[in-house]
Each structure stands twice: as structure tokens, then as C-alpha cells.
């Protein structure tokens, strides 16, 4: 099982990249799971805090507060541990797991320490001005991976079609990203 930890700022196209990559891998007869660290966080916020599911300013602050300020502050490996536990329960279910919301170094290192083949991909959208307020932009969930080593950089500066065309899947799941590092 190869795990792609996909990082990048909010709005840079992490989910879009993951979905395109998933489709390309599936076209190569690979079994793919797209799994977010925040899937459980969102469920908790809906059930425990009556969150309406909107990632507006209030919703994003709630997600950051519960996910980082409360849970990560007490148990830094809670989210990645949950994902690793699920993957350990189903070791032969998927060839590739794509995690499009990697935000902290431990979310990469924990999986490596558990023996997973981890590829860290950073999605960058040059010149994109985030609509988030300054507090949200400076939150550790947006900045913790700034300068952290990556295996590949994906530049998402055009259309979805441009992004799709820049990703080539070759040799049973090995990907190449145009103008980037091969993964």
C-alpha cells in the first residue's frame, strides 16, 4: 500500500489533485481510497457542536479549534492514528491511499514509522489569494508544513483540465507530474 500525503494551503487544489489522481490510478486497475484526516473531525463537529457542514469563516474556525486547539493539543497523533488504525485493519484492501488534507509533519512521519510507503506531495497555487481571514491563514494547520521536505510539488496554476493533463500515470501507479518531481 502506498500512501500519498497531500499538503498545501486551503484552496490550492489538494482535493482536486487527489480526485484526478484517484481516477487515473483506477484507470490503471489500481484500488484507491481517498481518505481525509478531517473526515472524523467533521463528523464530530456535526454531532457534538451542531456544525452545519459549511466551511465558511465560522465553520473553518470551528474545525481548526476542535481539530488542532483541542484534540491535537492533547493528543497530537489522534487523527493520523485513527487513519493508521483503519488502514491496519484493511491491509490488503487498497493499493493506494490518498490523504488530501495533510497539515502537520507528524501526519507524514507517523505513517512512515508504521511502515507505510509514504509519498508527500505539495500542491501549490501561485498567486492565489485566500479568502480566509488572517487568523485562519496564520493557524498552525495552515503553516506547519511550510518548508517541510516534499517528494513532489504540483503547481496548480491553470484550469482543472490543465491540472489533469499535467499528471501522467505510468508503470502501474507511478506518477509523473509535468514540471515537477517524479513520484
Language model regions located:
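Hydrophobic anchor at the beta1->P-loop junction of P-loop NTPases
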Residues: 6
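P-loop (Walker A) phosphate-binding loop of NTP-binding proteins
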Residues: 9
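Post-Walker A helix-loop "phosphate-sensing" segment adjacent to the P-loop in P-loop NTPases
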Residues: 23-33
